[in-house]
Amino acid sequence: MKKASRSVGSVPKVSGISKTQTVEKTKPENSSSASTGGKVIKTGTTASLSKTKSSDDLLAGMAGGVTVTNGVKGKKSTCPSTGSSASAPAMTTVENKSKISTGTSSSTKRSTSIGNKESSSTRERLRERTRLNQSKKLPSAGQGANDVALAKRSRSRTTTECDVRMSKSKSDNQISDKAALEAKVKDLLTLAKTKDVEILHLRNELRDMRAQLGINEDHSEGDEKSEKEAIIAHQPTDVESTLLQLQEQNTAIREELNQLKNENRMLKDRLNALGFSLEQRLDNSEKLFGYQSLSPEITPGNQSDGGGTLTSSVEGSAPGSVEDLLSQDENTLMDHQHSNSMDNLDSECSEVYQPLTSSDDALDAPSSSESEGIPSIERSRKGSSGNASEVSVACLTERIHQMEENQHSTSEELQATLQELADLQQITQELNSENERLGEEKVILMESLCQQSDKLEHFSRQIEYFRSLLDEHHISYVIDEDVKSGRYMELEQRYMDLAENARFEREQLLGVQQHLSNTLKMAEQDNKEAQEMIGALKERNHHMERIIESEQKGKAALAATLEEYKATVASDQIEMNRLKAQLENEKQKVAELYSIHNSGDKSDIQDLLESVRLDKEKAETLASSLQEDLAHTRNDANRLQDTIAKVEDEYRAFQEEAKKQIEELNMTLEKLRSELEEKETERSDMKETIFELEDEVEQHRAVKLHDNLIISDLENTVKKLQDQKHDMEREIKTLHRRLREESAEWRQFQADLQTAVVIANDIKSEAQEEIGDLKRRLHEAQEKNEKLTKELEEIKSRKQEEERGRVYNYMNAVERDLAALRQGMGLSRRSSTSSEPTPTVKTLIKSFDSASQVPNPTAAAIPRTPLSPSPMKTPPAAAVSPMQRHSISGPISTSKPLTALSDKRPNYGEIPVQEHLLRTSSTSRPASLPRVPAMESAKTISVSRRSSEEMKRDISAPEGASPASLMAMGTTSPQLSLSSSPTASVTPTTRSRIREERKDPLSALAREYGGSKRNALLKWCQKKTEGYQNIDITNFSSSWNDGLAFCALLHTYLPAHIPYQELNSQDKRRNFTLAFQAAESVGIKSTLDINEMVRTERPDWQSVMLYVTAIYKYFET
């Protein structure tokens, strides 16, 4: 049964060759192979069952069914029968007849494939060679060996063709989402065929499982012979009886299907109890066809079996399927071996192309090694075969693990991409609403600007009036209206240009948005039309199926009527024969009566004759009536035959029409697929347009923020003019009061400065203690190397001269700054309070540090604003161990008093030497300060107060300035303070980007690395953990299941908390505990459960990605 199904299943469907011809060709081939090899197999009628398989099942049959010529070997195969072996012959016959009628559509559909034609030509050449070999009928083993070698060469060619077909099927699977519509139509067309295919699969798999588990292996050839005889006896003579038997067998087939499913589940549970799993599949073609170069040899075997034994130089080294591994394990216990290398290849090929349609199909991977039942080989090779099988199991496990990882990574990336697409759609909607809101705000701002311009004109008239009053009273004032009017005109012109550009860009954006919305509506309409077309096609298909069912029912009714008429004709024939016999008897009686008449009384004889004549007339009338009834019955039978012929012609025409409709459906499907590809391209174009719109919206926001700044400047100017009108008479009193307050603040500032000097003295004393320790170390180093001491003395002398010059220059700069501060603490306090906080001891020390680093161009202070990004990330306080804190606190703490005390003590001769010693000691032990450069660079990033001090010096007036000039100063100072504010140097684009990064920290990472946010975060993790051992981050699930990835990622920031060299991948709980504790020590809350992470091999990738995002947000943003 197994061999017959595989041999015909491997033959592809070719146009122009009918099903019945294929079946007729298969029957003599199988019968001749059975007579030559001395083994009995079932007839080829069961082979037509495999013709209704789908494309994947056809490939599976091709991979496993090339062994059709193995019947020439003459080996006896024990085919264990299923539980329902009694009803199997009749059922097989019924299935063969049904497959002849139901497989025509699939054969016509697949006839266009070039690969199938090549496989068909190869199959025909193989069949012709097999016929020639069978016609010779040579009983010798040498001739059988030549036939087997020829079959093996044909098998290698067919296996190559299988490789080509497998690559094509893989390329089709890559566009599975585009072929979803085609799959639906195909499922509807093959709905009536899948049940029979599943029955055949379950039968074959049940035999394979029983062969593996050693159940019912002692079946004789008598069963096969009896099944064959039953098949021949039960073959129907006409189509009508076949249809009747099909209807009768339908319920039996369903019951057997349920029984086979139950047995299949039972065997599956039994295998799971033994510790094996059949759900792992081989999806890699390299594993399958890597052993095609094996050269099998034919060794003559026992002549009583009529064949030979197949051996190979690398017996058992090829990787087998899971079923082969199970069979090898069972056969090792039973001292038998049922497989070899080429059969393993067959079973693997059939497994690779086997589709998994349901949970019960997990066992549906036919293996030819168990079905063929190859005899056992020498015991000396069992050890090497066992070792090779262990190596094969290890390779299979590794490859399966790799394929599972790739599959999970791909699904994870697809889920992340879909989620980001949904986020982008939401962002697009938000941007559209924001754009509309900005348009409304722009209208409101334009109205407000018009109102402010009206107020400005009104205030300008009032100012002219007040100036005329000042001129009448001979009060002097500063005339700067020309400069102001020019600046106002320039600002107004710029604002009008910006407003015009904004309106033009908004119109463009609205046009693009309308175009995109129209395109989206058209795409939705096309999709709706495609769905409607698919629904219509489905309805049409259902209608055709209903018509076919009604025709079949009508045909069955006609067949039943014909049977009734035939039975009536037969009964009439029997009655007519009986009457003929009765007539002969009556004639004999008449003859006897004539003889009696001649010898006896005539009157009595005449009465008898009269009665006999009456009976004769009655019999003749009855015979004539029966003949007329017979003629009518024959006419009715002829009419019914004509009706049946017409119905068959109509059925053939309907089949041709159905084929045409299927071709039209395929063409429609191709059109839908092309339209779907066009929709995909349009979707990608829409995505690109969305990205462009996002950039334009960001630019629009930047322009809007800039416009807001200009408008705020104009509003501030208007407010200042209004305040100037009201405060002009009270300005002098206010200034006197402020002078008194600022003098008090200046005294407080001097007291704070004295406190800072005291603190600096304390720091200096600590630094001197550290310097003493460093001097002792330097003395020890000088004793070790005298040559270096001389060089150090030379360097020391040069450094002393340089440091003295720096200290003197610094003292001069400090004195100038202090003088400027004393002079500028007057009116400049008003402007400085609006833009800067009150100076404290910390800010003074930082300003002195930044001033002391000005002569060194590499350590120049970088002014930083609250919103500007930091030039270098510094680790938090928890990232430094206590030993590192102690070693870092020396150079950092001792560098401050060198500059903080320079204004009070300008004649320190030892300061350059000590500073030089500190630098020398810091360079002599770089291993103890692995992260000191980052801390020192962080020290240089301080807020510089030089710009504000220069501004104060510029706007400060002499102490004896006139009140009018002070009032003029008051009008200009707010403008200067606005331009010197910390947020003035940040552009609107930078502000919006910083807000976006704070809201979504992965957006900047996605812009940096490109692609999706998930891939960008994955690349960042790979870059951060580069160089760490046992770390391979490919996804956010299985790559993090041992905790080493978390430890490596946090070790880059917190090396004191994680001893990475002491960790291993086996102690998962310790790894996760260290990583989560280190993250919690700096404020990163743990969102993962340690027990769940330790227990599961593949944690939830979204939870892991969320936690890694929190780590990135804390340390990198």
Swiss-Prot record:
GO terms for cellular component: cytoplasm; filamentous actin; gap junction; microtubule organizing center; spindle. Residues 1-176, 293-323, 358-390, 852-878, 920-997 are annotated as: Disordered. It is found in: Cytoplasm, Cytoskeleton; Cytoplasm, Cytoskeleton, Spindle; Cell junction, Gap junction. Residues 293-303 have a biased composition (Polar residues). GO terms for molecular function: beta-catenin binding. One of its GO terms (biological process) is anterior neural tube closure. SUPFAM superfamilies: Calponin-homology domain, CH-domain (SSF47576). Its main location: cytoplasm. It holds the Pfam family CH. The modification Phosphoserine is found at residues 384-385, 389, 868, 881, 887. Keywords: Cell cycle, Cell division, Cell junction, Coiled coil, Cytoplasm, Cytoskeleton, Gap junction, Phosphoprotein. Residues 45-72, 99-119, 358-377, 971-990 have a biased composition (Low complexity). Residues 168-280, 394-449, 487-807 form a coiled coil. Belongs to the cytospin-A family. Involved in cytokinesis and spindle organization. May play a role in actin cytoskeleton organization and microtubule stabilization and hence required for proper cell adhesion and migration. May interact with both microtubules and actin cytoskeleton. This is Cytospin-A. It comes from Canis lupus familiaris (Dog). The lineage of its organism: Eukaryota, Metazoa, Chordata, Craniata, Vertebrata.
